[in-house]
């Protein structure tokens, strides 16, 4: 699924992050990337997602060389990335609306995707993530756990085949964090997603990277 060959990447100040790094992730596998702050964990996710490009070497996902963001790759961040002026429902539907403009490959407008179908998909994920009762609320009106559930629903509504998660539960309280960790395991079992999770805790790495 993920093939990293001879990856070299430096920060703008010249600091070397990766030098000739190679890695393989098979379809359906779950990996946890563990390490201290500043060691390049998030940078690795951004490189796999196509948000940054290597100085040398190449990254392939699903057999395709990554030269730009890949529509089938889902990325969930610690900061949620929600639009504060949009409701929970609108935030969950955002990816589907963008796909309606640019198409599944991110470059070609589709022949047509029924608005009704998008609404049904959005509602299904609101139900699955337990968000239906706050669907009309804004991000500032709901809890951190609900905001992260919204981000997860928005990403998974697009049916990605690769899910990248950058310390998604680090800012949550312990009960909410455990709840969302278990939810992630359930969703992975249901979908067979290939998953890479960045974390700074050994316990979370052991749980989500197994």
Language-model segments: what does each one mean?
Residues 1-192, 196-197, 201-202, 208:
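ABC family nucleotide-binding domain
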